[in-house]
Amino acid sequence: MDKAEAHKILTEQLARFTDHAQLVPLVESQHIENCEVFGASGTRYQVEVQFFWDDAPMRAIRVVASIDDGGVRAFIPLTETLFVSPHEHTTA
């Protein structure tokens, strides 16, 4: 798996989830977003995004995205986390 390409895809996917008000229903319903994305190299990646309260309900939301190419990385996917507060967001 091309880590740079996978990281770019994760960054693009996380950018879709920065509005706290829109994320609240996803956390409350325990929604998991799954999709397949093709990288510039033609590699097919599986992306999973999960949503959690970070510390307490109605406060910061932790958005966790993971990616793999179906190979060995499927057992240990590349993962990135975004924290979205009601007023701002940060990436870890």
Label each region the model flagged.
Residues 1-92:
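Flexible, low-complexity segments enriched in proline/glycine/serine and punctuated by aromatic residues
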